[in-house]
């Protein structure tokens, strides 16, 4: 954390970039009250700003349908208001008003609720479905209050992506606008956000303090990266992404400009660095918030499980991670050696349980029915399911969460065994294509000294090792081709003809698209994993399992 010298200022704003877990109303309220005291007493702030729906956490989803939950949030706001002696606080909460609920932010001062703003633009796309829960107040007022002679307005998150809410707030007299957010991370979002802030400040002339929540919530990871922008369009360097921290700024009213006072620099803002930190934060918070102190994973000596192991160690510490080597008759000696090498390097306990007894037992049990058949993918899947049973048994007996190691490419085309390698409670690589997995592994090996993933893991051909001399490319196109097609089809919703026009072979495109369609049922049963792309599998890509449409 860096601090600049305290200088004369018109307004000091303390922006609370912290994690406010969904549903933890009492915990969030206690922390908000503590943060109010810190902002007033430690930073001598005039205003303390909290994220969107800080009291309830975001997104509360169907908790908002429970009257008791809404009443609890309202009671919490009253408690918080009572703590606002000598400081102004802006706090997000779900406001119940008869039969409707608003996504609201209230201005609290000297023990009372001075004003409340109700969000006008409710996102209803991708991961958002706010119109399921919230209403827009057609008669809602602008929220502008005076703090030390400065006219301060409030709008909420999505409101900033439309010109009208900010314009109306400025027309009502605001020169400084506070924007509480709960905006989840995806690749490229920081540049998009900074461009938006520059545009909005230039067109309105208002200065903007943009606060985003931080932390993992199921498949969503909120990155923080809060930022301020001067009235002339200058966007200051952001606070660190995925870090709980204060961002304290001094606002000069006459100049409509900010001077950062307390902040944490973001450091490496490369795409790989941000994606890594998103996954690690998502994994850490999923475990912590759901009561898992340790994790298990099957370590094969391949790239996917090696990357998940490194992520788990970064998230939880090596002492809380147990890797399990599950060799079969088809496992190469190199695979065993690489698993052992990585665990030694990371200080992770490695257990070895051969799957041959379980596999042979299943073959014997099924033998009478399989007598007149030839071995095929069924026998391959029995190996994967044997591994899944063993990992889940360890979790049941000793506690801890099993991590699955599949990637987005595999989930897309069904190159994963349901109840086998898909067993587990969290999928760190779920929104990373195989080519991105390789890229992240190479990037992580450049950070912090010795490689955390053996280089031979990265360089060897990917293989499920379920039969002799098997490689992934026996069943799939090369990953650079496969991922190029998948990105266009899944992330960008391009048609078959569009993808072929981009240079991909028509028969390959048709094969890949058919696999995607056929494996919707598998994806519906997959564990959650952190969203890092514009279009992740899960709540933002809602295709029916039973689907008669085969058009492109």
From Swiss-Prot:
Annotated positions binding L-glutamine: 125, 183, 189
One Pfam family recorded for the sequence: CN_hydrolase
Result of knocking out the encoding gene: The deletion mutant is able to grow in the minimal medium MMX, similar to the wild-type strain. The XC_0719-XC_1067/nadE double deletion mutant is only able to grow in MMX supplemented with NAD(+), but not in MMX alone.
Active site: 52, 119, 157
Positions annotated to bind ATP: 298-305, 405
Record region (Ligase): 275-552
GO biological process: NAD biosynthetic process
Domain CN hydrolase: 11-253
The keyword Lipid metabolism is assigned to this record: no
The EC number(s) this enzyme carries: 6.3.5.1
Catalytic reaction(s) noted: deamido-NAD(+) + L-glutamine + ATP + H2O = L-glutamate + AMP + diphosphate + NAD(+) + H(+)
The protein's annotated pathway: Cofactor biosynthesis; NAD(+) biosynthesis; NAD(+) from deamido-NAD(+) (L-Gln route): step 1/1
GO MF entry, a single one: ATP binding
Ion transport is among the record's keywords: no
Positions with a binding annotation for deamido-NAD(+): 381, 410, 522
Bridged cysteine pairs (disulfide): none
Similarity comment text for this entry: In the C-terminal section; belongs to the NAD synthetase family.
Entry function: Catalyzes the ATP-dependent amidation of deamido-NAD to form NAD. Uses L-glutamine as a nitrogen source.
PANTHER family, alphabetized: GLUTAMINE-DEPENDENT NAD(+) SYNTHETASE, NH 3 /GLUTAMINE-DEPENDENT NAD + SYNTHETASE
Name this polypeptide is given: Glutamine-dependent NAD(+) synthetase
Origin species: Xanthomonas campestris pv. campestris (strain 8004)
Gene: nadE
């Amino acid at each position: 954390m860096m601090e600049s010298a305290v200088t004369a200022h018109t307004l000091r704003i303390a922006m609370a970039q912290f994690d406010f877990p969904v549903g933890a109303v009492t915990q969030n309220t206690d922390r908000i009250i503590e943060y109010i005291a810190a902002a007033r007493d430690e930073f001598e702030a005039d205003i303390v700003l909290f994220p969107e729906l800080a009291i309830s956490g975001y997104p509360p989803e169907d908790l908002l349908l429970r009257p008791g939950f809404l009443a609890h949030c309202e009671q919490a706001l009253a408690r918080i208001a009572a703590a606002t002696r000598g400081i102004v606080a802006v706090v997000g909460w779900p406001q119940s008003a008869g039969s409707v609920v608003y996504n609201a932010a209230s201005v609290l001062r000297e023990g009372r609720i001075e004003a409340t703003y109700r969000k006008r633009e409710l996102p209803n796309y991708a991961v958002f479905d706010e119109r399921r829960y919230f209403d827009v107040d057609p008669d809602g007022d602008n929220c502008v209050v005076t703090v030390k002679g400065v006219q301060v307005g409030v709008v909420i998150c999505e409101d900033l992506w439309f010109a009208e809410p900010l314009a109306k707030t400025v027309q009502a007299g605001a020169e400084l606008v506070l924007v509480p957010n709960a905006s989840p991370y995806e690749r490229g979002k920081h540049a998009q956000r900074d461009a938006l802030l520059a545009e909005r400040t230039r067109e309105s002339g208002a200065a903007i303090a943009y606060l985003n929540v931080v932390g993992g919530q199921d498949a969503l990871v909120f990155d923080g990266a809060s930022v301020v922008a001067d009235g002339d369009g200058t966007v200051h360097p952001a606070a660190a992404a995925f870090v709980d921290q204060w961002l304290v700024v001094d606002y000069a009213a006459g100049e409509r400009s900010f001077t950062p006072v307390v902040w944490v620099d973001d450091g490496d803002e490369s795409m790989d660095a941000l994606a890594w930190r998103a996954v690690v934060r998502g994994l850490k918070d999923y475990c912590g918030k759901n009561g898992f102190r340790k994790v298990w994973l099957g370590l094969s000596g391949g790239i996917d499980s090696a990357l998940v192991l490194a992520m788990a160690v970064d998230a939880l510490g090596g002492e809380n991670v147990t890797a399990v080597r599950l060799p079969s008759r088809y496992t190469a000696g190199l695979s065993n050696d690489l698993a052992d090498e990585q665990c030694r390097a990371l200080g992770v306990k490695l257990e070895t349980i051969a799957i041959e007894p379980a596999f042979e037992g299943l073959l014997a049990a099924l033998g009478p029915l399989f007598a007149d058949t030839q071995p095929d993918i069924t026998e391959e899947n029995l190996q994967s399911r044997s591994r899944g049973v063993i990992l889940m048994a360890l979790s049941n007996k000793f506690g801890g969460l099993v991590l699955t190691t599949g990637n987005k490419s595999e989930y897309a085309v069904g190159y994963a065994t349901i109840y086998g390698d898909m067993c587990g409670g969290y999928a760190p690589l779920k929104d990373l294509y195989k080519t991105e997995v390789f890229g992240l592994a190479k990037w992580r090996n450049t950070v912090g000294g010795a490689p955390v993933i053996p280089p031979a893991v990265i360089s060897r051909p990917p293989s499920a090792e379920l039969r002799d001399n098997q490689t992934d490319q026996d069943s799939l196109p090369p990953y650079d081709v496969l991922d190029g097609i998948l990105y266009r089809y899944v992330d960008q919703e391009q048609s078959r003809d569009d993808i072929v026009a981009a240079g991909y072979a028509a028969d390959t495109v048709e094969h890949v698209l058919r696999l995607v369609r056929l494996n919707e049922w598998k994806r519906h049963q997959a564990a959650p994993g952190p969203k890092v792309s514009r279009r992740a599998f899960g709540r933002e890509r809602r295709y029916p399992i039973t689907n008669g449409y085969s058009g492109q």
